[in-house]
Curated annotation (Swiss-Prot):
Belongs to the RRG9 family. GO terms for cellular component: mitochondrion; nucleus. Residues 63-166 are annotated as: Disordered. It comes from Neosartorya fischeri (strain ATCC 1020 / DSM 3700 / CBS 544.65 / FGSC A1164 / JCM 1740 / NRRL 181 / WB 181). Residues 1-65 form a transit peptide. Pfam families: Neugrin (PF06413). Keywords: Mitochondrion, Transit peptide. Required for respiratory activity and maintenance and expression of the mitochondrial genome. The keyword Transit peptide applies. Its main location: mitochondrion. This is Required for respiratory growth protein 9, mitochondrial. Signal peptide: none annotated. It is found in: Mitochondrion.
Length: 280
């Protein structure tokens, strides 16, 4: 019995055996579920007329397993879905309507907030329109009052008696354009030197000569000479100390250049103190 071989089993080959097995499994899977049969037939319709020649491959037999199982709706519902207009079209039309009506002037309906805002704006504009005439009237009053006050001030100034210094200032302005307010200001030492030179030799150091020497107007020299202000003794002492420091600084610079500084033995021949010896 062990050595005996079945003739029917010897006729079976491996390809035919595998074909029978997969056919039975495929029929068992698709038998109770008719909806999958119809769906598979709809999706694989172009391949229905083809004949498979030769042994079937594993990739062609496993197509049923690759079919997605998520879409469980019947073919009737799929047909209904295909007959229903797609949702993209109304969405597009709605978007077009929204874009067309995005202009605020074309919007028919408005919310209560927008109505209240419009009402407030209208009331504010009316208030401003009503307030403008009052503002214009007040501005007209101010403008009409300003010329009156200016004219009154001019009249009061003209009627008021001028001071002597004002009369002199006006006369100087007419006679000397820059004499009453010279652009060049002289130092106190220069003013003292002008007074001293004019006091020592009035015939030599006249007003035009001093004006040319100090580069100021003759009127400025005249006012300097006419001035009665004199410095106090303390101020004179400070000026003398300042002049001495200036003298030392100048001679230190000259000694750096190679010039000799005067000695004390030559002080009696110097005329430095002449400025302080003679009265002003």
């Amino acid at each position: 019995m062990a050595n005996s071989i079945c003739i029917a089993s010897s006729r079976l080959s491996l390809p035919t055996l595998l074909r029978n097995v997969f056919r039975s499994e495929f029929a068992a899977d698709l038998g109770p579920r008719s909806e999958y049969k119809s769906l598979f037939a709809v999706q694989r319709a172009p391949l229905a007329y083809r004949r498979i020649r030769g042994p079937r491959q594993f990739s062609s037999l496993t197509l049923a397993d690759d079919i997605p199982t998520t879409s469980k709706q019947p073919p009737s519902s799929a047909a209904n879905v295909s007959s229903v207009p797609q949702p993209d079209e109304p969405a597009k039309t709605g978007a077009g309507e929204i874009r067309a009506s995005s202009d605020p002037s074309e919007i028919v309906g408005s919310s209560p907030r927008t109505d209240s805002a419009k009402h407030k704006k209208a009331s504010a504009s009316e208030a401003t329109i009503g307030a403008k005439p009052a503002a214009n009237e007040s501005s007209d009053k101010k403008c009409s009052g300003a010329p009156r006050t200016s004219s009154l001030s001019v009249l009061s100034k003209s009627k008021k008696k001028k001071e002597p210094w004002q009369i002199q200032k006006e006369a100087l302005k007419k006679k000397f354009k820059e004499g009453w307010n010279p652009p060049k200001k002289l130092s106190p030492d220069a003013l003292e030197g002008i007074r001293h030179l004019h006091a020592v030799a009035p015939d030599r150091f006249t007003t035009p000569v001093l004006a040319e020497q100090f580069q100021v107007s003759p009127e400025a020299i005249r006012r300097i000479l006419k001035s009665k202000w004199r410095p106090s003794p303390e101020e004179m002492e400070k000026r003398r100390e300042r002049w001495e420091r200036r003298h030392d600084r100048i001679w230190s610079q000259m000694s750096e250049l190679g010039l000799r500084r005067p000695k004390r033995s030559a002080d009696k021949f110097s005329d430095v103190k002449v400025l302080y010896d003679k009265p002003v």
